[in-house]
Amino acid sequence: ASPPEVNCSQYNRKGSGIACSKQLKPICGIDHKTYSNECMFCLLNQNKQFQIRKLYDDKCQIECTNYSAICTMEYFPLCGSDGKVYSNKCSFCNEVVKRRGTLFLAKYGQCK
């Protein structure tokens, strides 16, 4: 089953664009970016050429159950919720385990 669509029209206000609350109710987009709530998801994607869809409710996360404790030198950067860039999934997952699950994926690629 595909994830439910986000109805962005409910956040549009006539003449003023989108005004979002600071409510924290994270969603993960199909672009693997975590958005703080549906309204911010709509605001940040309103001018994109292609439609970003919601993947699921909650912060985006990487599956870390089958990671190796010894990592390769492969470079596929991941930005952690701590603002730090991890060189690949393996190094990110090692840090997730070390921090007992308090680290989340902010996005694929560099943080800035």
Curated annotation (Swiss-Prot):
Any single GO CC term annotated in Swiss-Prot or TrEMBL for this entry: extracellular region
Alphabetized UniProt keyword annotations: Disulfide bond, Protease inhibitor, Repeat, Secreted, Serine protease inhibitor
Site description Reactive bond 1 for trypsin, residues in chain: K22, Q23
Molecular-function GO term, any one: serine-type endopeptidase inhibitor activity
Disulfide bridge partners, by residue number: C8-C42, C20-C39, C28-C60, C64-C93, C71-C90, C79-C111
Intracellular or extracellular location(s): Secreted
Presence of keyword Repeat: yes
Pfam families: Kazal_1 (PF00050)
Keyword Repeat included in the entry's annotation: yes
Function, in words: This inhibitor is composed of two homologous actively inhibiting halves: one which inhibits trypsin, the other which inhibits elastase.
Official protein name in the record: Double-headed protease inhibitor, submandibular gland
Organism per entry: Panthera leo (Lion)
Lineage, broadest ranks: Eukaryota, Metazoa, Chordata, Craniata, Vertebrata
